[in-house]
């Protein structure tokens, strides 16, 4: 059995990360739905942070705080 990291939304509607020991990713999803009663599952991965399903920051603006001044930088 392997440890799978499951990123999901719990029954309260908050984002949650679960660590589930299962035989396969499908089995980990089944356990999350049945045992933990989650609402939505976003991602199932073997290692925490190894798979990414969010937008890359490469083309989005970010805020840099320089001496108390907020500067928005578009890259």
UniProtKB/Swiss-Prot annotation:
Q: Which domain of life is it from?
A: Bacteria
User: What is the protein's given name?
Assistant: SPbeta prophage-derived uncharacterized protein YorX
- This protein's species is Bacillus subtilis (strain 168)
- Gene for this chain: yorX
